[in-house]
């Protein structure tokens, strides 16, 4: 049965593992000789050499030695490093969303929350990798790390995290699918997004900018009234946009966007009308007034087969010290306005590690509870192992 698995340090608290990640491994056998000590199930044997303390792991289903430790664990005050064999023809994948990188043989990857969305950045790290040699590894930690798959020594793999102890899950299976299933057994299956999420989404800000008519050649955007307009985040003397077009500004509204998709027979699944800094979703003097404005858009959108969502620049729950424009109340947004999509921002999850996991776990529970059992649709980044059970990960703003 095993004992209690010690959770890694996390602040704020978050859970990498599911509540019940164990499965019955069958009968365990322990074999001791003068040379080594081995623990085995019917499928896997873990052996420790008495003279060196080094570990080898064998897949008994095919007799293959899949993991071989080539150097003792290096314990430093603020870092622990494991060194394994890097076999000829062995390839490595994982580490989360490593922008522009997916096959890591001969390379070093950072398991670090970099808040970088371009080539080589780490949009959402995960302390996990799998090998074509028949194994996978997941350090059980929220600490930053680095995995070197032969960039300095082509014959070794090093797993290093900023922690003074070693806590590591090893998984043994022959196919990538089975290794991923092992990982999901520990951390949870990827969330199944709602049906509307598989249709096109439209993300923009429709509660902030001003549109001023221009006759200058080659400038502006052509609208339905036959005129061209220049957009500005500052008041340029033009018409200010809104969600519902209630201020004689329909063609600059979020409702107009929904109508354009319908007019052009383009299936639209969801819309985020506040995807821009300082946008908000209403122009009244109170949070409740703005939520009523959001609900009005939601009712119109749902009548046209579209769900609404929000980009989350601000805190999810009310903070009295900030203006009504940027106030948030996630419960009322979901329960009253009918919000069914949330896209995170660095202001919410940007600290990463346990912070990123903690924040979306909260919303993943709020959405079905206050949203009539709605399936959560969270678009996120800056995650960790376990993020996949709550939301879909994107690569960030390029």
Question: Model-found features: residue ranges?
Answer:
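Short, charge-rich amphipathic segments
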Residues: 147-156, 207, 214-238, 291-307, ...
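Aromatic- and carboxylate-enriched substrate-binding clefts and catalytic-loop regions
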Residues: 7-19, 69, 267-398
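Short, charged low-complexity intrinsically disordered segments located at boundaries
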Residues: 120-121, 158-159, 209-220, 289-291, ...
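Structured segments of extracytoplasmic/periplasmic soluble domains
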Residues: 186, 260, 264, 366-369
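Aromatic-lined carbohydrate-binding surfaces of glycoside hydrolases
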Residues: 198-245, 258-260, 264, 271-288, ...
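N-terminal accessory segment at the very beginning of proteins
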Residues: 1-203, 214, 235-245, 249-254, ...
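A general structural signal for stabilizing positions within well-ordered secondary structure
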Residues: 119, 260-262, 333, 338
């Amino acid at each position: 049965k095993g004992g209690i698995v010690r959770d890694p340090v996390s602040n704020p608290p978050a859970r990498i593992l599911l509540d019940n990640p164990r499965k019955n491994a069958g009968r365990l056998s322990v074999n001791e000789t003068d040379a080594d000590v081995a623990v085995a199930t019917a499928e896997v044997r873990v052996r420790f050499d008495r003279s060196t303390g080094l570990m080898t792991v064998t897949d008994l289903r095919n007799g293959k030695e899949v993991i071989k430790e080539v150097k003792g664990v290096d314990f430093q005050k603020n870092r622990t490093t494991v060194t394994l064999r890097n076999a000829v023809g062995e390839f490595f994948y994982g580490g989360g969303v490593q922008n522009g990188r997916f096959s890591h043989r001969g390379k070093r990857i950072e398991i670090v929350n970099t808040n970088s969305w371009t080539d080589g950045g780490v949009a959402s790290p995960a302390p996990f990798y799998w090998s074509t040699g028949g194994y996978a590894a997941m350090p059980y930690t929220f600490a930053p790390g680095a995995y070197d798959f032969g960039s300095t020594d082509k014959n070794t793999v090093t797993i290093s995290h900023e922690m003074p102890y070693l806590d590591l899950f090893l998984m043994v299976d022959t196919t990538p699918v089975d290794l991923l299933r092992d990982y999901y057994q520990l951390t949870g299956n990827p969330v199944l997004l709602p049906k509307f999420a598989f249709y096109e989404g439209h993300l923009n800000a429709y509660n902030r900018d001003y549109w001023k008519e221009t006759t200058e050649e080659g400038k502006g955007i052509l609208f339905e009234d036959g005129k061209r307009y220049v957009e500005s985040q500052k008041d340029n003397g033009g018409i200010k946009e809104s969600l519902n077009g209630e201020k004689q500004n329909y063609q600059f509204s979020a409702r107009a966007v929904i109508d354009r998709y319908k007019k052009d027979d383009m299936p639209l699944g969801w819309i985020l009308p506040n995807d821009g800094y300082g946008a908000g979703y209403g122009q009244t003097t109170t949070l409740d007034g703005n939520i009523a404005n959001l609900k009005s858009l939601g009712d119109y959108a749902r009548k046209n087969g579209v769900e609404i969502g929000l980009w989350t620049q601000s805190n999810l729950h009310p903070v009295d010290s900030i203006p009504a424009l940027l106030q948030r109340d996630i419960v009322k947004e979901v329960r009253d306005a009918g919000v069914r999509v949330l896209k995170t921002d660095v202001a919410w999850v940007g600290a990463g590690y346990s912070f990123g996991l903690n924040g979306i776990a909260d919303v993943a529970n709020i959405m079905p509870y206050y949203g009539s059992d709605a399936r959560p649709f969270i678009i996120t980044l800056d995650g960790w192992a376990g993020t996949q059970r709550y939301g879909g990960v994107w690569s960030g703003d390029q």
